[in-house]
Amino acid sequence: MRPIPETAVVILNWNGRRHLETYLPSVLKHTPEDVDLWVADNGSTDDSVAWLKEHHASRVSVLSLEQNWGFAEGYNRALQSIQAETYVLLNSDVRVVGDWVGSTLMAMAEYGWDVASPVVVQDLNPERLEHAGAAGGWMDVDGFPFCVGRIFKQCDNASDLDLRDRETFWASGACFFIRRSAWLKANGFDGDLFAHFEEIDLCWRLKNMGSSVGCHGGVQVRHLGGGSLPSESPFKAYLNFRNALLVMLKNRRGWWPGFMVRRMTLDGLAALRFLSQGKWAMFWAVGKAHGAVYLRLP
């Protein structure tokens, strides 16, 4: 029997051949040979799987899922079949450089982190931090995520910050290192979330169990972003507003009605802003998200 490898990099793909062609070469170049490389295909209807088997069968293992399970459940199902001591969940639109695996693993060992991510910068403008994690994720009291180097949509230049190793509240799902023991302890992602906020939810649950999460400042990866859902997608807005509420209600300690009143007010203002811009689909996405959450309240 083959021994369990120390690390496995797992890329979840859905109709992303264009991203695989662009970004997979950097993963192949900068990932050590003793690290397993997997692409878990989420029921793609393009020729991603055929292309991988034709061009990279000797290095990349392909796991085909029968349908698009979304980011959260897709990874849950994929990792049931992949053995490793540490998983690296890597978006298909991420470009890696240097000793990105080994350096991050060393930081995890040094600080005792169960979950970590490197600094995430923009692929098209690598001087600037990227929305999905930047230099470490945090959450404010009203359930709005922010990052070191990123507030809402405003991202700082990486050179303007002290990019040291630091403990954070959540790690970027674009390049997400997690110990297998922690993954199993938390039972993976919440598949009901489908996509968005799943890494925040998992990190929060693990922190409630006593685990620590960090950002490794010694490595930067470059993320394109919007690879599956564009920023102005009503479905993306629905998932973001719905999942933010669900994650807060599930993990936050305290009196939930008071929190819900605040979020109803703040999200209502966001919906009115969409309405003032003529973005009717985005406006309805906020209302639909709240309706889906209210149906789950006790």
Where are these regions (language model features)?
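Short, acidic, metal-binding catalytic loop of nucleotide-sugar glycosyltransferases
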Residues: 25-34
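Glycine-rich, basic loop-to-helix element that forms the pyrophosphate-binding segment
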Residues: 64-82, 92
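Active-site-adjacent helix/loop segment of glycosyltransferases
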Residues: 10, 209-298
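A recurrent flexible, glycine/aromatic-enriched loop bordering the glycosyltransferase active site
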Residues: 141-147, 152-181, 200-202, 229-231
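A conserved acidic beta->alpha catalytic loop
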Residues: 26, 41-50, 67
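Conserved donor NDP-sugar-binding/catalytic core segment of glycosyltransferases
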Residues: 95-133, 137-144
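A short, conserved alpha-helix in the catalytic core of glycosyltransferases
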Residues: 163, 169-220
